[in-house]
Amino acid sequence: MVNQRAVRLLASIGLSLLAIGVVAAHGILRPANWLPPIDSEAGQILLKNYNTTSHFFFIILLIISCGWLLRLANINRERNSLERSTQQSLWTQLITAPRRHPIVAGLFAGYTVIMVRQASWFYKEMIGWYKDILGGHLLDNFSLRWSFVQETMFRNDFRFFPLAHQDLHILSWLTPYVNVWMLVNAFELFTIVVIGAKTAELLSGKNKQVPILLAFSILFLFDAATGFTFFQFIYSERIVVLLLSVFYFYYTRSFQQHQTSDKYLCLLTGLIGLFFKDTGFLLFTIPAFTVLVSGSIGLIANRPRLRRHSIQEWLRAYDLELCLCGLIVVLTVCFVYLSYLPSLYAGVNAYDSHLRWSRFEPDLRLMALALTVLVRSVQVCRGKLAFSALDAFNVGGMTYALGLFAMVGFRSSNYMALPVQFASTLNLVVLANWLIGWLQTRGVNTRTLGIGTVVACGGLIGIEHLERRDFAHRINKMQIAQDSWVTTLDQMDQISQQALINGEEINIIYSKSWFRNRGHLERLTFNRLIYYDLDLQTYTVIDGTGKGSSYQPKSGDFLLNIDTGRRLNEFGFDMSPYKKIWDYSDKKSNGKIYRRVQ
């Protein structure tokens, strides 16, 4: 696939850089006597300049690498002359797709309407990331936002996902309207579904007896993790799974057809996928490692074993897998220079280290995935089943789930589980095809089996909805949270306007909240906007009269609880001087406005 001399050169450079980074970390930064203290102004400037310079070179090298891989893929594109003459154009396929798949087209349309109706500015981190965009009358969206850069490239807490959220960053330059952003979310989601269905067709071989696209759509669109991720904007798993779907498709084609262009496109998606999630490398390297090990011990037909006298043949046969495994070296070098060194200098603890091995909440899909891995592994080792690319993907999905469990815990309904749910959905659809192909040989009617498969998919969704962590409850919970935030904010605006008309002094107290960056709160009417620090138990005037000074609460002050919830009670905040004057719902701990009466 690639020149072996070039591979050796790149590997040597990578390992050399890694060695230099390790020496720098343990031999220079740990004593760090010649460096300014991190808590000094000079130390902060040094850290910021280092992050800026290192990430600038990283982005330039990544762009060059992606361009090089795209060029190689284009040069090596192998097309069958018969396919070129008979294959429909992309536009023709798009135009005729609703006619060929009317149920899926209707499902996509209805799903998009629900997504757009759900669109809102009120998504946790977005309130801080775009705190000033409303103040500019939605006209200053085309600008670099420090909040996005700081969130990903300047964290200095040993986390590593430099490209996360940058798709949203770039999208916001084109339009500031969240309804348009949600349409892009829908396009990404449906692209994943279509590519996933195409991959399932390739993996199924001749057993394409079920409506694959419809089955895949039902299973993936109505999973709780899908709703959690795509009905919001703030989670990078959207792009990770989009890249993963493309990776699975080209890797399957490469595994079956051995086209060189597919190998380069696999490597391209794997390279980009490394930098959107710190655990994402498992999704792109574990399948390759699985194929490498399985083939080397003779479990894959038409792939050579690892023998001393045929090492060159082995290298040629597993060139893609070796390159994908080599991405670990690329990731390690980038992590050392972009995250480990600055984090070590900053002297902070690893983010969310207290969540390691904290919880493991599987669902039926994950159990089916684990059972498939176990059964097929035994049967492949016994020679009863042929190794498939699906086996590699399943191992990758399970490894990713265990990796999440080790890092931050695993919950199947959480947005972080989306890559696992994609692998699980692919596994279920392919297994259904294989099962129907087997039943068809036993004389069972194919049409009946196809309808039964779709009904079974709907039945699985129904079973999942018997729990509280399903798709519908997840979407409803998000909608209620967003509505409580915006309704409470609007109500506070009305109350403050009326207080102004009455000639009253307006002092608004708020506490720990996603609204702490004040972009939305500063638009309220007030004399003073006051922040109460729950940890220090101090009041500080953030805006208005006496800005920056301490404050002593007095009668008539407003206490605003948009999303603080139970934390006021948990931190022992004395609520006795306050009277509730508005409540979004007595069933929720947030969405409340109080007024001090003492």
PLM feature spans:
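Transmembrane alpha-helical segments
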Residues: 223-225, 337-341, 408, 431-434, ...
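Membrane-interface transmembrane helices that cradle and orient dolichyl/undecaprenyl
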Residues: 244-263, 301
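Extracytoplasmic loop-helix module adjacent to an early transmembrane segment
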Residues: 35-44, 102-160, 168-173, 417
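Transmembrane-helix motifs of polytopic, lipid-linked glycan transferases
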Residues: 183-207, 246-249
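Start-transfer (signal-anchor) and selected internal transmembrane alpha helices
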Residues: 1-24, 44-116
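Membrane-embedded, lumen/periplasm-facing catalytic core of multi-pass transferases
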Residues: 456-525, 529, 589-598
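Hydrophobic/aromatic-rich transmembrane helices and adjacent perimembrane loops
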Residues: 237, 360-364, 409-443
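Transmembrane-helix signature of polytopic, membrane-embedded enzymes
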Residues: 197-223, 241-242
